[in-house]
Amino acid sequence: MPNWKKVAVSGSNVNFNQITSSGDMLFQDSILSYQTNTDIDTGTEVVATIDGSAYKAAFFDYVAVSASVNIRAGSIMVAHDGTNTTQAEASTQDLGNTAGIKFSSSIDGSNNFRLSAAVSSNNWSVKTVVRGI
């Protein structure tokens, strides 16, 4: 069976059923990135990082899971000025209890824009799709 490939030509209309990427996807001055930390233990750990010198805002779409029964999905919107971050979160209601996880954002010394999770018990998993603009 032949394996046909579509070629996108400037000015043409191409319909792709699926695009698979093993890395980040760049769209002009924006980025789409899948990042995960699947073993967050008691304390604070980085979940996702994005280049703060390239992007002033990021949207972290996430699912947080503990013990397979404590689940929350949401989106954390973060903006920064190079020194400070501000964030807002919209999320689903808990399935089980996700009170044991709190998210925070920061800028590190290399101007990386970070989303961190502070957890009160071991074995949390957070998967994110990060949109940087």
What are these regions (language model features)?
Residues 1-46, 51-54:
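Intrinsic low-complexity, repeat-rich intrinsically disordered segments enriched
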Residues 7, 17, 72-80, 103-107:
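Broad, structure-driven detector of short, well-ordered beta-strand segments within folded domains
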Residues 14-15, 66-72, 119-127:
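Short, surface-exposed beta-strand/loop "edge" segments at domain boundaries and coil↔beta transitions
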Residues 21, 29-30, 66-68, 80-82, ...:
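Trimeric beta-solenoid/beta-helix "fiber body" segments of extracellular/virion adhesins
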Residues 26, 61-63, 77, 116-118, ...:
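Residue-level recognition of well-ordered beta-strand positions that form the cores
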Residues 46-82:
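Beta-rich globular "head" domains
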Residues 77-100:
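Terminal beta-strand-rich extracellular "head" domains
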Residues 93-133:
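Low-complexity intrinsically disordered segments
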